[in-house]
């Protein structure tokens, strides 16, 4: 029988996103993993469609993720991304780089996540770029909305 502490460590996490402004990201912990919740701007959402040819798995066909995240934004609500913040290469934590065209990532960078350990890049839907060490998209954890401003991570039924 698992201890109360062990049960709590695996329990779903309820998050209030009422103060999460467009363009912002917050971090929460679920099952000992960092989970990012990103409120994407209209421009960021529009840019996602421009990246398909640069991505390894733009339609998330090769990924294990909830069925409701198998769309262009990989989200229940298009503007809100919920993703596990662990690189699918060797488990480092990528940095949030929403800026467009920074010198170190190139003029064609439209915002996303960059893993400083080995250079893997992911777009703002957590989809991995071609030609980087990471073999697959960032994980989308099970989650559901309890209201417009409350998300439950770790449970989707």
Please give the residue ranges for each predicted region.
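Rieske [2Fe-2S] iron-sulfur-binding domain
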Residues: 53-155
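Extracytoplasmic/periplasmic/luminal assembly and interaction segments
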Residues: 19-72
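Solvent-exposed coil/turn segments that connect beta secondary-structure elements
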Residues: 31-33, 40-42, 118, 148, ...
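C-terminal segment of N-terminal export signals and the immediately downstream linker at the start
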Residues: 1-27
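A structural detector for beta-sheet-dominated domains
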Residues: 16-18, 29, 146, 154
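Short beta-strand or tight-loop elements
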Residues: 11-13, 33, 139
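General structural signal for secondary-structure boundaries
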Residues: 11, 22, 41-42, 144-147
